[in-house]
Amino acid sequence: MGMQEEDAKTIDGCATFFKGSKYILLDKQLINFGQTAVRRPDAKGQDDIYNRLWQKDHIAVVIFLENRQTGARFMVVNAHLYWDPAFKDVKLIQTAILMEEITKLSDNYAKWPPCTDKTAFRFSEAETGSEKAPVVEPAPSMEYSSGDQIPLLMCGDFNSSPGSAAYTLIASGRLIESHPDLEKRLYGNLSKVGMTHPFKLKSAYASIGELSFTNYTPDFKDILDYVWYSSNTLHVSALLGEVDKEYLRRVPGFPNFHFPSDHVALFAEFTIKGKRGKVVEADFGPQRH
């Protein structure tokens, strides 16, 4: 698995699209992992930050949305980490920085007051091309007691398999400073005291067993892409299944006419949990092991 020389010269980018008729964009933030790392007070004298991490241009995009109809607020994070298997430490530190920045943003968003004047946010429930529907007043904004109570979706190409340190940090909320993926390299406090985050994150596909792969080429197949969600605030209600196995027997790799990328699309549908009461768990049938 590698990158073409011309592609390597291109600055990395991520895009997050949302339905403007349904959601209000409250805030948007860009996280550049390399620039964020060198601005840390503990970066001074840490050569690995400058020699291995700072040169990488990978980013994450964070948006903070409010549902016009329900007033529920939530965060959506779209991230892309470094690809090279020889840089497991870089992927881990990018993940740690991502989780730190999301924590700061969510704590700040929890303090945001509700929108009082929603005249500009009135909406119509009519779909494009259908008969005109009456204009509806938006619901009152929901408030949250802490950042980890705000529903969170985090998706992207993490270039990390389920057994990696990056995956473990996201899924468990902590990672010791002596993890072998760090290779005893120095990244300030992140490599001195370990890494943590407060979110109860789960991979959406883990509820049925991770897919066999998300990246499929003739010489490389692995799980690199994920849709993470805060399990204390969100419930998985639907998932897009895996690629047909009979089709895969005839196709050695992607991209091709049917799959325009070597990464397959992941699709998940979520329901926001109420602050009280239980959500009935979806039945996805036999689990994949």
Give short role names for the model-derived ranges.
Residues N32, K91-L92, Y167-A171:
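Short, glycine/charged-enriched secondary-structure capping and boundary segments
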Residues K22, Q55, F64, L105-H289:
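Metal-dependent phosphoester-hydrolase catalytic domains
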Residues L81-E100, K118-V136:
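Active-site-proximal segments of metal-dependent phosphoesterases and phosphodiesterases across multiple
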Residues M1-D89, P198, V227, L240-E242, ...:
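Structured beta-strand-rich core segments of catalytic domains in phosphoester-bond hydrolases
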